[in-house]
Regions:
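Carbohydrate-interacting/catalytic domains
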Residues: 1-52, 58, 83, 88-89, ...
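Short, well-ordered coil/turn segments that N-cap beta-strands
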Residues: 6, 47-49, 92-94, 180-182, ...
Length: 510
C-alpha cells in the first residue's frame, strides 16, 4: 500500500490564499507563498499528510492559463522560495502535490505567442488543437483554435503531438528532480488524451513508484481514468454531491446508495481510493451550501469515515463561507489569516476535524476497511467497516432530536472515540442513543491508542526535559496526568507516551 492510500490531504488555492493580485503585471517576484510555512503546525495538528497546491506555474490571471511550466508565478514568489517550502514541508512529514494544467494554456504561453508572431511559419502551429488559418479567433487572431469549454483565453493543447507531450512530461520531471514533489493533480482530466496519461504514468512511476497521480473528473465511469495504466485516483464528485444533499434533504438513503454502489459488496470502484471532498476552489463552501450549520461536523465525519482519501479545503475546517457569485470564484478563493481563524472561526468544528484526523490515523479499518450498511433511515445512518479482523461502526444522526439505533455486534464492548463515551453491549445487542446533530465512531473498548486522548495536551513543568515514565503533569482543570510508559505505534512507529489520569484511572496514548 502506498502512502497516499492512507493520507489526509489539504487543498490550497495559492493565488487566493496569499492575496495575490488578480492580474500578473510582470515585475519582480514577491514571495507571498512563504505564508504557508506559518501554517505547518496547524497542518500537523490536523494530521495532514500532503498539501495539494492549486496552480502555481506562471500565468496571467487565475493560474489555469499557464504561460511557463517551469516557473513559479511571480505573484507567489520564486522557484528558490518554493524549493525551500518543499524542503520544510518534507522535513515536517508533509508531501507536496502540484496542479498540472496540461489540457490547455494561456494566450501568453510562449509557443502560442510564437504562432501569433510568425503565423504559418511557426514550428508550433501543431501544438494547439484545431488551429487553422481558415478563419479568425474571437480575439482577432488571423487563425482559429479550440478554447477549453468555449473559453478562448484557455488555448487547448494538442496532446496527440508527442512534442507537446514531451514538453509537459519533461516539466514534470523538472519538478520531481529539483523540488522532490510527490504527486500531480490533473486539471480537466476528462479532456486529456488517454495515451498522454499512460505515458506520464510510465515516466513518473519509473522515477518514483509512489508518485501520486490524481485527475479531476466530474462525470462518467471513474475506472476509465483510475486504473493500473493511467491514474491512481480521481475526484469523487458523485459523493461530494451526495454528502451535502443527503443532509439538506434529510435523506441518508442518497449517500448510502452512492457509497454502496462504489464500495459496498460488489461495488464498482473497489480497489480504487477516490479523492473525497466536501468543497473546493470551484464549488460553494460547505458552510454556504448546507441549510443548517449543525450538519457541518456530520458531513466531515462521513467524509473521513467513508472509503477513499479525505481532503480539506483551506479554511473550511473553521467553517469559512463562500459562494460563486456574479460570475466570479473570488468568494471561494479568499485570502485567509490563520490567527483570525483561530480567534473567530468555528473552533468547535476545527476541534472536531483535529479529532477526526487522529482517529483516522489510529484505526486502519477507517482508512482501508470494507463498507457495509447496518441501518439506513432518512435521518440516521449506521455503517461498519472491517479490516484485518477489526471492526469500526460509524453512526450519524441529522435529526434535531435524540434518536436510538439498535444493532447486533460480535464485539464485547464498544466506545465512541469521538466523545469517549462507553457503549454497552448486552448479549451481542447494542442500543446507541444519539444526541441531535451528532456522529459517533464506535470501536472495541480494548483498543488503546492516541485517538482516545483528551483534547488538551500535557503542559510539562520543564519542556526541555525528555518525557520519562513516572513524570507527573498538573493540568489547568486540576487533574494530574502520570506517564506510565513509552511505546511505539504498531504501524507508523511514531513515538507514543502512555498517560494515566490519577483520579479516574483512564489510560490513553499520545
Amino acid at each position: 500500500m502506498n502512502w497516499y492510500d492512507n493520507a489526509i490531504m489539504y487543498h490550497i488555492y495559492p493565488l487566493g490564499f496569499c492575496g495575490a493580485p488578480k492580474h500578473n503585471e510582470g515585475g519582480e517576484p514577491v514571495n507571498r507563498l512563504e505564508k504557508v510555512l506559518d501554517w505547518i503546525p496547524h497542518l500537523k495538528e490536523m494530521q495532514v499528510d500532503a498539501v495539494y497546491f492549486g496552480p502555481i506555474f506562471e500565468s496571467v490571471e487565475h493560474g489555469y492559463d499557464t504561460t511557463d511550466y517551469r516557473q513559479i508565478d511571480r505573484r507567489l514568489g520564486t522557484n528558490e522560495m518554493f524549493k525551500h517550502i518543499c524542503e520544510v514541508l518534507h522535513e515536517n512529514g508533509i508531501r507536496v502535490i502540484l496542479d498540472g494544467v496540461f489540457n490547455h494554456v494561456g494566450r501568453n504561453f510562449w509557443a502560442f505567442r510564437d504562432v501569433q508572431e510568425k503565423g504559418q511559419a511557426s514550428p508550433y502551429c501543431d501544438w494547439f488543437a484545431g488551429l487553422n488559418f481558415g478563419g479568425s479567433s474571437p480575439y482577432g487572431d488571423p487563425f482559429w483554435y479550440e478554447g477549453w469549454n468555449g473559453y478562448y483565453n484557455l488555448v487547448k493543447l494538442n496532446l496527440k503531438n508527442w512534442h507537446v507531450c514531451d514538453h509537459l512530461i519533461e516539466a514534470v520531471g523538472y519538478w520531481m528532480d529539483e523540488f522532490q514533489i510527490d504527486g500531480i493533480r490533473f486539471d480537466a482530466a476528462d479532456c486529456v488524451d488517454f495515451d498522454f496519461f499512460k505515458r506520464i504514468r510510465s515516466f513518473c512511476k519509473g522515477k518514483k513508484p509512489d508518485f501520486w497521480l490524481m485527475g479531476e473528473i466530474i462525470h462518467g465511469d471513474y475506472k476509465r481514468w483510475a486504473n493500473p495504466e493511467m491514474l491512481d485516483s480521481v475526484t469523487n464528485y458523485e459523493c461530494y454531491k451526495g454528502i451535502y444533499s443527503s443532509h439538506n434533504d434529510k435523506n441518508y438513503f442518497e449517500i448510502n446508495y452512492s457509497i454502496n454502489r462504489q464500495f459496498g459488496n460488489g461495488g464498482i470502484y473497489q480497489g480504487i481510493n477516490l479523492y473525497n471532498f466536501v468543497d473546493n476552489h470551484d464549488v460553494n463552501r460547505l458552510a454556504s451550501t448546507l441549510v443548517d450549520q449543525r450538519y457541518l461536523p456530520l458531513c466531515y465525519t462521513l467524509m473521513y469515515a467513508m472509503p477513499g482519501i479525505p481532503s480539506v479545503y483551506y479554511g473550511s475546517e473553521y467553517g469559512v463561507q463562500g459562494r460563486h457569485e456574479n460570475n466570479s470564484d473570488d468568494g471561494l478563493r479568499p485570502c485567509l489569516d490563520l490567527a483570525d481563524l483561530q480567534r473567530s472561526g468555528n473552533l468547535d468544528l476545527y476541534r472536531h476535524l483535529v479529532k477526526l484526523g487522529r482517529i483516522y490515523k489510529a484505526y486502519p479499518a477507517l482508512r482501508t476497511g470494507s463498507y457495509e450498511t447496518v441501518i439506513v433511515r432518512n435521518r440516521q445512518l449506521l455503517f461498519r467497516k472491517d479490516w484485518d479482523g477489526t471492526t469500526v461502526y460509524v453512526a450519524l444522526n441529522l435529526e434535531d432530536c435524540c434518536s436510538d439505533m439498535q444493532f447486533g455486534t460480535h464485539l464485547p464492548a464498544l466506545v465512541d472515540v469521538i466523545s469517549g463515551q462507553p457503549i454497552d453491549v448486552n448479549n451481542g445487542n447494542v442500543n446507541v442513543h444519539m444526541q441531535p446533530f451528532s456522529s459517533m465512531i464506535l470501536v472495541a473498548d480494548d483498543i488503546v491508542n492516541h485517538a482516545d486522548a483528551p483534547e488538551t495536551v500535557p503542559v510539562a513543568a520543564e519542556p526541555e526535559k525528555p518525557v520519562e515514565a513516572g513524570d507527573r503533569y498538573q493540568q489547568e482543570d486540576g487533574s494530574v496526568w502520570k506517564v506510565v510508559s513509552l511505546a511505539s505505534h504498531v504501524e507508523t512507529q511514531e513515538e507514543l507516551v502512555i498517560y494515566q489520569d490519577e483520579a479516574s484511572g483512564k489510560v490513553w496514548a499520545m
